[in-house]
Amino acid sequence: MQMDRKTQIIDYDGNMIADLKEWMIRNKLANLGFNYNVVAILGSQSSGKSTLLNNLFKTSFDVMNTKLGHSQTTQGLWLSFDTFEESPVSPLEKGNSTTPINPTLILDVEGNDSKERGDNRLTFEHRSALFSLALADCLIVNLWYHSLGNFTASNYGLLKTVMEVNLELFQQDKNCPKTILLFTVRDWFEEFASIDIVKNKIVEEYLNKIWAEMKKPPSAKKANINNYFIVEVVGLSHAIIKKTEFLNDVENLRKKWINELRPLQYSRNIPSDGFAHYCNNIWNTIVKQSQLDIPSQKEMLATFRCQEIKNNVISNTSKMIKEKLTASSSQPTSASIDEFKSWAEKDIVEKSLDEYFVDASRYTESICLKTSEELLESLFIQLQTIVDNNLNFTQRVLSAKFANELNTMYSVCTSDKNVFLFSKESNLQVHKDGNGSNSSKEDKKDENTSQDKCIRLWSSFLSNADKLEYITFCNFFESYQKCNIEIRKKNKIHEFNYKPSLNILLTSICKDMNRIRNTQFTVLLERTRATIKSRFKNMDNLLITTKNPEEYWNHTLKIVKALQESINNNLTKCFINLKGGGPGSSVAGISNELFDHDEDNTFHVDSPSEGHRSISDNRTAHENKHYVDENLLNYKKIDIIKNKGKYISSVSEEIDKQIKNKKAISELNNYYLDEIMDVLKSKLDEISDNLSSIIIQRFESVFNYDDAEQPRHWREISMAELKKIFRESKNYAFLIIDILQKNIKVELIDDYLPNNFIKDEVIEKGKNKAKRKIQEICRDAQYIQETGGKMSLKNVPLFFWVILLILGWNELLFFIRFFFRLNIILPLFLAAAVILSTLFFNGNMEVLSTINKVVFFLAKSSFGFYRQLQTMGEKVAQVPTAD
């Protein structure tokens, strides 16, 4: 713990050591406010400075071991402290013995006239003396009695430097505290001379002489040394020969410091928590502003005072800036942006400069002006935060406005889900200006349908987004220019940094644009796929009538080519506008982000089926390069706005280049083909899943109907003829498998659908299911043929219905009474009548035939049940007769 009571603050090479603040915190010295003092000691090497401080302030500085010879012990500057815990204030002096004593920081300085430093010693000696003078309330000058009269050993040159610098540092400050110059005369004997004589010699032959030789400013010519220094001289006995007297002298000096010399507060007005930083600044100022190894007193003074004035001005204006910053952070408004320029110019910049130049203009002009620039820079740094808040608010508003306007413009496209009704006219030749403009007649025609309006909007998406982006940038700079400040004293305008907010705006615009763009591309793609799907919706019906694979697949190929041509003619410009662009992309540089080009402007695709994936991969591959290119193009827009030039969009030209690029159009056609074939595959998968149903429909289309497409009358057809029809129908039905397996070569389709693309297990499952149903249909036909007229209600004789009514009369009445009791007979009767009438008039003979069978079965069963009941009744009637 004793070792931690001291620390080196400047090393032998003159470098400031950075841990002074931590040392003060550890020793509880950082929270003293102004309630502390600083003492520094100067003197020749090996003159006993550290020994004196250790005895006077109970420190533990290293001292020289004379038994090992004379050498340099203290290197650089060391700092320790004394809290005077065991030394109460004298009641005679202070009137209150319980008053606490402020801690004192003790600065032990490397000795002068060092042999080890040689000829280079003067630079460090002067720097350390200036540093000590800037910090110390009390500067102890340690010298030997027998050196009085010598030049070097008596520190005459050092005293001259100290007095000159002190005058220049503090002459302008009328309230400047006096520095205590405490001369400790070592090895002093009362027998040689009294202390008054020694003090008189030091004051007259040293201090007054130096003061008289100094060049003083006019305001100080009539002043004397007592206006700037409090001079004290103390004689100390020999530390070895008269050790007891020496210790008594030191103790008396300690009491004198506590009760008489010590200022109540630190005279340099530096709070203890800023002392470490203050030391660092003082030392760096001394080191950096030295000329010929000796600081220029005038520049030192100007630097010190201008910095001090600057800091005071900043401190005075910071409160207002903080209040404005709080307001701008919590709830910025358009009004606060408009008001910023006014109060920032008048209340901050102009007021601060006026306050600064009142005091600083008396010092060196170059340093004064340089420090004023530092003052403005400091103010602008604080104001920049408010400007950032204002610009961030502006960019949020503009970003939301951009997204809302672009989204509203394309909302009609999002709501329309209908399939495309393609026209024969190519969309590639329409709206060449990218804005949907052509002849007035064509425009009027385009606006007649929602489809044409959507296509026109999609074809000009990038151009519309580019215009909105430019308008957004213009609005942003209009708000930004309201933030720039005019400095009237310097006749210039300060422009704040807008790039962070602009970059956020750019990113937000890019994200919103790409989000809307991707949404519109999804809508376009879904409608395109729905259109393709609608063209393929009759493919399963075509399978019912198709008689060979060539007919079916040639018809499918015609549909594919027609779709590809229609999409190319009508939607290519839409796809160029809406497809492409990765995160961070903007409307600028569209030709780069659409496809992957090489030097001859060609594309690289592995295969037609890879087209979609290849285009998507290119978006990621060029993302970083595009971001840089697009930023450059966006900043060109900014330069045009700043220079008030005219902006001409190049987006339409880039899109026209893509349309004229044969390779690009070919690549898009491959992409269209990918989408068409994806839908075709889905349709064929759907057909494969319903294979049995289609086989059955094909079978029934031949089996149940003749060549004239009339229903067959099976009761008029022989069994041999029925079997022949069955074989022909079955062969025709199962021909569908050969058709779907595509065992022929088909242009374009072969690249996507191989031969025999339907799995064997799917085919077998469909065939087995279809066979069972076909056999069931055949059995029904055979049954109808075998029963012939017996199954017809028309062939039932009239007398049969009369007999049925007579024999079942009681049962009929029983059921009628029962159902009428439940109130359901009439609704059931009406429902049955409606169903039978509907079936009859719709010609649904199969259902009527089934109902006919059910009725006959019920009639037969009822008649048998009736005969059984009648027999049982007769037997019961015969039993009483027998009895």
Swiss-Prot record:
Q: Which Gene3D superfamilies match?
A: P-loop containing nucleotide triphosphate hydrolases
Q: Among the entry's GO cellular component annotations, what is one?
A: endoplasmic reticulum membrane
Membrane topology per the record?
Multi-pass membrane protein
Q: Where does GTP bind?
A: 43-50
Question: What keywords were assigned to this record?
Answer: Coiled coil, Endoplasmic reticulum, GTP-binding, Hydrolase, Membrane, Nucleotide-binding, Transmembrane, Transmembrane helix
Stretches in topological domain Cytoplasmic: 1-795, 841-883
Keyword set includes RNA-binding: no
- Give its E.C. classification number: 3.6.5.-
> What HAMAP family does the database record attribute to this sequence?
Sey1
Its family?
Answer: Belongs to the TRAFAC class dynamin-like GTPase superfamily. GB1/RHD3 GTPase family. RHD3 subfamily.
Q: What is this protein called?
A: Protein SEY1 homolog
This protein's species is Plasmodium knowlesi (strain H)
Write the gene name: SEY1
